[in-house]
């Protein structure tokens, strides 16, 4: 399902992904609030189209202004426990990891996913990018369905 929203001009490229963080303090009193604040806070989105007919609008948050784009919920790549991980099954993230230098850290704590939620696995990607887990977790890299799919 595609939604039209406004994003900063620097982000306004087809294929760009972002996690919607909600209203910023600079949004108060903005005439474009309804077009800008129409996504679900915490969800990851992918830009599918940049509206070429639209103009760049002034924005108190984005210094170069905002553009109209079409977005859809984006899937999330994440590490989940290997046991029971197969396409179509449900999984939760294994929990926080303090090892931020690990190549798997962005997949163990992916932006746009919460630890206390269950997600449906759409695809098994394969082995995680790390050689071994410093928390001794047996993990598999998967693609989680976008919320609302």
From Swiss-Prot:
InterPro entries: UPF0179. Pfam families: UPF0179. It comes from the Archaea. Signal peptide: none annotated. Transmembrane segments: none annotated. Disulfide bonds: none annotated. Belongs to the UPF0179 family. This is UPF0179 protein rrnAC1064. It comes from Haloarcula marismortui (strain ATCC 43049 / DSM 3752 / JCM 8966 / VKM B-1809) (Halobacterium marismortui).
């Amino acid at each position: 399902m595609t939604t039209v929203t406004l994003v900063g001009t620097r982000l306004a490229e087809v294929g760009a992904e972002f996690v919607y963080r909600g209203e910023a303090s600079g949004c108060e009193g903005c005439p474009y609030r309804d077009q800008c604040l129409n996504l679900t806070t915490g969800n990851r989105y992918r830009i599918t189209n940049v509206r070429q007919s639209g103009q760049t609008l002034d924005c108190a948050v984005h210094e170069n202004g905002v553009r109209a784009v079409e977005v859809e919920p984006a899937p999330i790549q994440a590490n989940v426990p290997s046991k029971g991980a197969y396409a179509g099954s449900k999984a939760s993230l294994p929990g926080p990891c303090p090892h931020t230098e690990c190549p798997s850290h962005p997949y163990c704590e992916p932006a746009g996913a919460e630890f206390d939620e269950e997600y449906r696995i759409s695809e098994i990607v394969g082995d995680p990018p790390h050689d071994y887990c410093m928390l001794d977790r047996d993990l598999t890299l998967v693609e989680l369905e976008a919320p609302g799919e």
